[in-house]
Amino acid sequence: MAREYPLERYRNFGIMAHIDAGKTTTTERILFYTGKNHKMGETHEGASTMDWMEQEAERGITITSAATTTFWQRHEDADFTPDDSERCRFNIIDTPGHVDFTIEVERSLAVLDGAICLLDGNAGVEPQTETVWRQADRYKVPRIVFVNKMDKIGADFFKCVAMIKDRTGGTPCPIALPIGAEDKLEGIVDLIKMEEWVWKGEDLGASWVRQPIRDELQDVAEEWRGKMIELAVEQDDEAMEAYLDGNEPDEATLRKLIRKGTLSLSFFPVMAGSAFKNKGVQPLLNAVVDFLPAPTDVPAYLGFAPGDETETRNIERSASDDQPFSALAFKIMNDPFVGSLTFTRIYSGQLKKGDQMLNATKGKRERVGRMMVMHAINREEIEEAFAGEIIALAGLKETTTGDTLCDPAKPVVLETMTFPEPVIEIAVEPKSKADQEKMGLALQRLAAEDPSFRVETDMESGQTIMKGMGELHLDILVDRMKREFKVEANIGAPQVAYRETISQPAEIDYTHKKQTGGTGQFARVKLQIEPTEPGEGYSFESKIVGGAVPKEYIPGVEKGIKSVMDSGPLAGFPVIDFKVALIDGAFHDVDSSVLAFEIAARAGMREGLKKAGAKLLEPIMRVEVVTPEEYTGSIIGDLTSRRGMVRGQDTRGNANVIDAFVPLANMFGYINNLRSMSSGRAVFTMQFDHYEAVPQNISDEIQKKYA
């Protein structure tokens, strides 16, 4: 089976939005109109419409699938003639609603070619919009802005356009204006064709009328068309010269120039409408075809050879079926019917059912079993897939989020996702016996989906411990456990994952001797303990010469040392960053054993750690606060009061960026403080950076607490 659609007619895009901007409704409308468009030839319009919506409501499409494939033929008249040679294939990728998870956002941005950014017509650019926008800037993702909810009281399109400029630093380029607002919203003015699109019928927005622009809107339309053309002609010297000579570009040239400016991120086309009132969605879909990139418009992907520690990116993969197969697994989801599904973006080459793939990240082979494409309301089993496609693979055993899959003969690693160690933990207990069974399964599935989340059992208390990257991270996982898996649980207060280490070298000579009649126990060890550089971890070596300790007893010595590492002498936290050498010892022909040397090493290490100046370490977070300038002073003062160290300031667009190191212990509840200090306009991201010694007065308090 050959490729059904040429790569130029693919659009892989996501919908980015602040939490209440109407993402679900917009996605539902897109799926409704594209689905109807797909079946328009064979189903009577009225008959399919309502079933489709009911089915969609039942199945919760926008929630259950990480990527949905659907189809759209660009058209301007409601009663157009379907033509397969004109149809585009849309892969709509679900971008996470919560932007605090850098890992979640980065992995979805890695597979997007373009995006629709939704704004609430009343609220405009909100804090979370700014955060997603910045991350999309970093990944150079072209965007179209859709000012949604224009039917809402207080909706103001022009205020939203100004906010894009002020708050993101990006250049907005309106290509459509709303006709009316609030309950008088009728449709849009298309500034490229200079005509109105008006929706009047009661058919869920399936039909509209194109008509000349009414007199009272003519002046404002001319003004904004002029601004649009000025931005567009900057993309091409010839067009600019012609425009300065009084010649406006024709419609086809104008679309080409707007496309060029969008792809180069010179500006962002802005449109308007109301998904809830079914107005403005079809022109938005046409704009996806006209202005968002196909996989062929995206620069070639550079990867490195598996095992290359320098990660030199010199292996090129571009969107072509003729290149070796390469793909990125970007999301693991559990499907009630199929089991574990690995959502995968194919960057280059082809994949057939039964093929062997190499998981280049892990060095393991996987066989392609079931392959499917997720359509809005069903999954379609496929036999092969091509570059630019987004598919789901069932039953992969070794693959997790962020892994590269490739041709075993031409290996490449596309992405490296390093998942930092968790820095915060909470104890979680099921409320009932029924919850207990469900909780185990829920935690297992959540951990499979999110590599930055860990679950462990506390050996002493038997409690289940959830570990993650921050307070919000764990809050949301607990919420998902409740919503998706119906597990009710009691949650403990968050705890910081402290560590212990040593500050100076020490030598310890310890003898273990026990006589109880019959065979006794005897072992003597002389240990040299030294601190290592932060992050170097633990190492052990034997420097025994002349058989002072026989070889067969040395594993017992190391086992004894390791048994002390899990619980340090100060407050029982894991001990890190030290090395131990066994430099001397003694044994007894009859009374010595592996166990005797293990006991001697354990007791010797306990003494040695105290002698070597044990100290407590705490996780230090790298905190980035993005804030309007007027709040900078109070935010810096607050960070300093939290034992923070401000490393620098920068400007980004019209905002100030504060970069600081702050102990995690002082960041609990920070989000609420920041909101009240900045009237909700400042946002922050936080990630673990390093461990650092705890000041003595605070260390004393922690030791008392855990004694």
Curated annotation (Swiss-Prot):
Q: Which residues bind GTP?
A: 17-24, 94-98, 148-151
Q: Which GO terms describe its cellular component?
A: cytoplasm
**Primary location recorded for the protein, binned into one broad class:** cytoplasm
Subcellular location per the Swiss-Prot or TrEMBL entry: Cytoplasm
Q: Which UniProt keywords apply?
A: Cytoplasm, Elongation factor, GTP-binding, Nucleotide-binding, Protein biosynthesis
* TM spans (from-to): none
Q: List the disulfide bonds.
A: none
Please give the superkingdom of this protein's source.
Bacteria
Q: Which residues form the tr-type G domain?
A: 8-296
User: Quick check: keyword Hydrolase in the entry?
Assistant: no
Listed Pfam families: EF-G_D2, EFG_C, EFG_III, EFG_IV, GTP_EFTU
In the record, biological process GO terms are: ribosome disassembly
Q: Name one GO molecular function term.
A: GTPase activity
PANTHER family given for it? RIBOSOME-RELEASING FACTOR 2, MITOCHONDRIAL, TRANSLATION ELONGATION FACTOR G-RELATED
Which family would the database say this protein is a member of?
Belongs to the TRAFAC class translation factor GTPase superfamily. Classic translation factor GTPase family. EF-G/EF-2 subfamily.
Among HAMAP family, the record links this protein to: EF_G_EF_2_B
Could you tell me what this protein does? Catalyzes the GTP-dependent ribosomal translocation step during translation elongation. During this step, the ribosome changes from the pre-translocational (PRE) to the post-translocational (POST) state as the newly formed A-site-bound peptidyl-tRNA and P-site-bound deacylated tRNA move to the P and E sites, respectively. Catalyzes the coordinated movement of the two tRNA molecules, the mRNA and conformational changes in the ribosome.
Q: What is this protein called?
A: Elongation factor G
Q: Which organism is it from?
A: Paracoccus denitrificans (strain Pd 1222)
The organism's taxonomic lineage, starting at the top: Bacteria, Pseudomonadati, Pseudomonadota, Alphaproteobacteria, Rhodobacterales
